[in-house]
């Protein structure tokens, strides 16, 4: 079963989002993530109007959604392995959000991709389990695959268990009678970026 996992390292102030999807090869990582040095990013910046609604729609158009991670992270590390390749053919792509990135071949047992955000000191709040849960519920509750995190526990001697933090059922796959009015409103807000 496909899934997404979020792991938090409170000590190092980092967040890792992993999936068990098809993964990427080294060439695909360079092609898909290497746009940081391409003109698309500067073209995107030139297209900004100052109108929050219009500008947020440009993100997908220019493929810079991934690069918004540098708003909260000093460094982003992506590790991946394509389902078509062996464990010895994984890839690690890393960047500090400047006009360059590093790529290396790594050994990776799991097929899929992990994205680690090494948070800026001013953004350490995102390494908090409760904070991330609320973000997942607000913006990704309708994602059709389960998003798993460790439970937040106050018992120091107890190993936290995994729990699914989203409903993992897209609104459009449920019957109208199952969907509450608040769910429609939250979905609309997330989709349209209308947070008023």
Task: Put a short name on every predicted segment.
Residues 58, 76-100, 120-123, 130-196:
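GHKL/Bergerat-fold ATPase module in large chromosome/replication-associated machines
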Residues 1-127, 134, 141:
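GHKL (Bergerat-fold) ATPase N-terminal catalytic module, capturing the glycine-rich phosphate-binding loop
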């Amino acid at each position: 079963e496909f899934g997404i996992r979020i792991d938090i390292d409170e000590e190092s102030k980092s967040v890792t989002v992993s999936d068990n999807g098809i993964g990427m090869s080294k060439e695909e990582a360079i092609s898909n993530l290497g746009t940081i040095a391409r003109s698309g990013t500067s073209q995107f910046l030139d297209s900004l109007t100052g109108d929050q609604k219009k500008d947020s729609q440009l993100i997908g158009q220019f493929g810079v959604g991934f690069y918004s991670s540098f708003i909260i992270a000093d460094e982003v590390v992506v590790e991946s392995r394509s389902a078509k390749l062996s464990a010895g053919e994984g890839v690690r792509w890393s960047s500090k959000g400047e006009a360059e990135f590093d790529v290396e071949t790594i050994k990776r047992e799991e097929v899929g991709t992990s994205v680690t955000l090494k948070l800026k000191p001013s953004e350490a709040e995102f390494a908090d389990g409760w904070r991330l849960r609320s973000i997942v519920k607000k913006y990704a509750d309708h994602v059709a695959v389960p998003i798993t995190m460790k439970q937040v526990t106050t018992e120091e001697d107890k190993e936290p268990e995994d729990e699914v933090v989203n409903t993992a059922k897209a609104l459009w796959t449920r019957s109208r009678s199952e969907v509450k009015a608040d769910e429609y409103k939250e979905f609309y807000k997330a989709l349209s970026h209308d947070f008023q």
